[in-house]
UniProtKB/Swiss-Prot annotation:
Species name: Amolops loloensis (Lolokou Sucker Frog)
Xref: Pfam families: Antimicrobial_1, FSAP_sig_propep
Family designation: Belongs to the frog skin active peptide (FSAP) family. Brevinin subfamily.
Protein name in UniProt: Brevinins-ALa
Principal subcellular localization: secreted
Propeptide residues, chain positions: 23-46
Tissue occurrence: Expressed by the skin glands.
Gene Ontology CC terms, in alphabetical order: extracellular region
Domain of life: Eukaryota
GO biological process, one term: killing of cells of another organism
Additional detail: The primary structure of this peptide is identical to that of Brevinin-1MT2 (AC E1B241).
Length: 70
C-alpha cells in the first residue's frame, strides 16, 4: 500500500510540473504573438510616412510631364 501511495504521489508531482511547464510555454507563445502585432503596427507607421514622402516628391514631377507646363 505504501508503494502505491508513493507512486501516485510521484505521478501527481510530475503531472503538476508538466502542467506548469506547458502553461509557461503557452504564456510565452501568447507574448510572441502580441509582439508580432506590435511590430506590424510599427512597420505600418514607418511605411506610410515614407510612402507619403515619395508621393509628394514624385507627383509634382509626374503632373509636370503630363501637362507639359514645366
Amino acid at each position: 500500500m505504501f508503494t502505491l501511495k508513493k507512486s501516485m504521489l510521484l505521478l501527481f508531482f510530475l503531472g503538476t510540473i508538466n502542467l506548469s511547464l506547458c502553461e509557461q510555454e503557452r504564456n510565452a507563445d501568447e507574448e510572441e504573438r502580441r509582439d508580432d502585432d506590435e511590430m506590424d503596427v510599427e512597420v505600418e507607421k514607418r511605411f506610410l510616412p515614407m510612402l507619403a514622402g515619395l508621393a509628394a516628391n514624385f507627383l509634382p514631377k509626374l503632373f509636370c510631364k503630363i501637362t507639359k507646363k514645366c
